[in-house]
Amino acid sequence: MSTKYKTTLAVLAGVALGAVAMQGLHAQAKPKAYTVSELETLDAAANAAFVPVIQAAQKAAGGRPLRTGGGKIVAMEGAAPKRVAITEWDSLEQAQAFYKSKAWNDLTPQREKAVKTIRRYVVEAVN
């Protein structure tokens, strides 16, 4: 085999491998998602017991609790909610699956004693 032929084959192989690698990287690049729960505490003691339980359930499902209600909420436009909980997920589908899961449904009695949900939604982080 001539050197020119070997070089051409090597370049073509490199291009093919690079294309396959880029395809794989592109397929994995799903945007993260965030659930935002606007809440009102109904019972402080029940809420204190509920927070670690819900965080453990979210973590078991792949979620990462970012904010669980403490700290200031400053209204920029409109009224600020009394309490906000934010959880990061690897994808919109992962967040939706958790909120349709048995683990979430099993927490309903405890959750309903602790907090009143004003609004809950999922935001997909797309650049």
Spell out what each predicted region is.
Residues M1-L12:
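Bacterial N-terminal signal peptides that target proteins for export
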Residues L66, L107-T108:
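Short, hydrophobic secondary-structure boundary micro-motifs
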